[in-house]
A protein has these predicted regions:
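Solvent-exposed coil/turn segments that connect beta secondary-structure elements
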Residues: 77, 89-91, 160-161
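Catalytic loop of the DD-peptidase/beta-lactamase superfamily, centered on the K-T-G motif
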Residues: 2-3, 32-85, 270-394
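Secretory targeting and sorting signals
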Residues: 1-39
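Hydrophobic (often cysteine-bearing) scaffold residues that line and stabilize catalytic clefts
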Residues: 50, 54, 105, 109, ...
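Residue-level preference for non-acidic, small/hydrophobic
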Residues: 58, 78-79, 110-113, 117, ...
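Short, surface-exposed loop or secondary-structure junction motifs
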Residues: 83, 143-344
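Short active-site loop at a secondary-structure junction
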Residues: 65-68, 92-153, 197-206, 281
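Alpha-helix N-cap and coil->helix boundary residues
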Residues: 53, 69, 127-131, 147, ...
């Protein structure tokens, strides 16, 4: 395997394919699973056919794709919420998967950060079409990279041309699993590579964009990104099961399914639940439950976090080529056509140990599917997305 192939594989694992939203069909099978349906106090689940289809899709992820566990939270148009699980939380003890357990949500963090930036835009403290240089003078410079020519909008929309720092992370995960990485180190890794395009060019997903956006937020507000996301989003929405881990916090709060990883498909799985998530920072560090993730995206699309003008900007998309036809990317938000018609809005995220796909619709549906290892090929990604489509379209 060449160095470029190794980098491409890590690049894929850390969020490129996982930012894609929803499309596909799902196979049917059975496997070890548990199901919990919750629709609020005293309300009965009246959609067994849809419920069974979602459960079968999770069972198939465990049986056919060998994900240790899969879990889902689905919100219907009428507000009913149902939770699903399949597999086991711990491969050693065979413990039951906790209903709506905590997972690392990876690149979904980008949407939280984009909301913070857009709130600051609404407050007149950041200009979307201002150059990055205005806020971070002299910081963003490299081979074909110049912060004087890159706007804040281009950062959030992945049209800046900034190269992706994850391409230079070590191939062997254990080398960095417990190491704290400074945000400036992540930026330096990105800037050590050549620009991928001119600013304002084609969409090219790069975690480096959101490292720069995080540094920009800290410079403008004088506070850590963690505090801004907590104070502006998590606390106001009452997201009691969402948090941005503090420096040195390597645990995932309980209850959670364990996360697993292998560097190559032929290797045995290693428990990587305990890890330093700083390699993701403002691009991928948040932890949440599936239902909290649904609540966040539902609130966002419902206008609870941004004014109408900022939300319109967020939903103004460019073509985002990838394995899903019709996918488009806005400002930290992706849209994808659903098999049942209409658009799904979400993001998705991969980080070592966990993969999440999620989306909400304009009519109030929301779904998050989480699996407890990273997909290792495109087929597994498609199966995760198919499970999400089943949850939204039934």
């Amino acid at each position: 395997m060449t160095d470029q192939q190794k980098r491409s594989r890590i690049h894929r694992w850390l969020g490129v394919v996982a930012t894609l939203a929803v499309l596909g069909t799902v196979a049917v099978a059975t496997g070890p699973a548990t199901t919990t349906a919750q629709a609020g106090p005293g309300r009965e689940d009246t959609a067994p056919r849809h419920r069974d289809a979602v459960q079968r899709s999770l069972d198939e992820l465990v049986r056919a794709d060998d994900f240790p566990a899969a879990l889902a939270s689905v919100r219907e148009r009428d507000g009913r919420v149902r939770h699903y699980t399949a597999g086991v939380a711990d491969l050693r003890t065979r413990a039951k998967v906790p209903t709506d357990g905590y997972v690392r949500i990876g690149s979904n963090t980008k949407t939280y950060l984009a909301v913070v930036v857009l709130q600051l835009v609404g407050e007149g403290r950041i200009g979307l079409d201002e150059p990055v240089e205005t806020y971070l003078p002299g910081l963003v410079r490299g081979d074909g990279v110049d912060g004087r020519r890159i706007t804040v909008r281009q950062l959030l929309q992945h049209t800046s041309g900034l190269p992706n720092y994850t391409a230079l992370l070590p191939e062997t995960y254990e080398l960095i699993r417990h190491r704290y990485v400074q945000p400036r180190e992540l930026l330096d890794m990105g800037l050590s590579q050549q620009a991928t395009d001119e600013p304002g060019g084609t969409f090219a997903y790069s975690n480096t964009n959101y490292v720069v956006a995080g540094l920009l937020v800290e410079r403008v507000t004088g506070r850590p990104v963690r505090e801004e996301i907590t104070n502006r989003i998590i606390t106001p929405l009452g997201l009691r099961h969402t948090y941005f881990p503090n420096v040195g916090d390597q645990e995932v709060r309980r209850p959670h399914p364990n996360g697993y990883h292998r560097d190559r498909p032929e290797q045995p799985l290693t428990d990587v639940t305990v890890m330093d998530p700083s390699m993701g920072w403002a691009a991928g560090q948040v932890v949440a439950t599936p239902s909290d993730l649904n609540r966040f995206f539902t609130a966002l699309l419902g206008g609870e976090l941004l004014g109408p003008g900022q939300l319109r900007q967020m939903r103004d998309t460019v073509d985002a080529p990838g394995p899903l036809p019709g996918s488009r990317y806005g400002l930290g938000l992706q849209s994808t056509p659903m098999s049942c018609g209409g658009l799904a809005w979400g993001h998705g995220g991969n980080i070592f140990g966990y993969s999440t796909v999620n989306a909400v619709t304009d009519d109030g549906r929301a779904a998050t599917i989480a699996a407890t290892r990273l997909p290792t090929d495109l087929a597994e990604v498609e199966h995760l997305l198919a499970a999400l489509d089943t949850a939204l379209c039934g």
